[in-house]
Amino acid sequence: MSDHFNFNEAFNSQTMRGRANVAKATWASLGLVYVLVKMHRRNTKRRETKLYCKGCQQAMLHG
């Protein structure tokens, strides 16, 4: 195995291993996008609740 990463060998569309690596990279990137979107929405929801009074926040969180 060489010391440096060879992109063309790792993601070669002619080999089964290369195709598997492409599939794994695709699923990993989709998972990453999903997590980032979930985190962003969660932070947005928290920011919106800070605009209201504490009683309103509790009603929104429990309601």
Curated annotation (Swiss-Prot):
F-type ATPases have 2 components, CF(1) - the catalytic core - and CF(0) - the membrane proton channel. CF(1) has five subunits: alpha(3), beta(3), gamma(1), delta(1), epsilon(1). CF(0) has three main subunits: a, b and c. The ATP synthase complex/complex V exists as a monomeric and a dimeric supercomplex that helps shape mitochondrial cristae to optimize proton flow. It is found in: Mitochondrion membrane. GO terms for cellular component: mitochondrial inner membrane; proton-transporting ATP synthase complex. Keywords: Membrane, Mitochondrion, Transmembrane, Transmembrane helix. One of its GO terms (biological process) is proton motive force-driven ATP synthesis. It is a single-pass membrane protein. The keyword Membrane applies. Mitochondrial membrane ATP synthase (F(1)F(0) ATP synthase or Complex V) produces ATP from ADP in the presence of a proton gradient across the membrane which is generated by electron transport complexes of the respiratory chain. F-type ATPases consist of two structural domains, F(1) - containing the extramembraneous catalytic core and F(0) - containing the membrane proton channel, linked together by a central stalk and a peripheral stalk. During catalysis, ATP synthesis in the catalytic domain of F(1) is coupled via a rotary mechanism of the central stalk subunits to proton translocation. PANTHER family: ATP SYNTHASE MEMBRANE SUBUNIT DAPIT, MITOCHONDRIAL, ATP SYNTHASE MEMBRANE SUBUNIT K, MITOCHONDRIAL. The chain crosses the membrane at residues 15-37. This is ATP synthase membrane subunit K, mitochondrial. The keyword Transmembrane applies. InterPro entries: ATPMK.
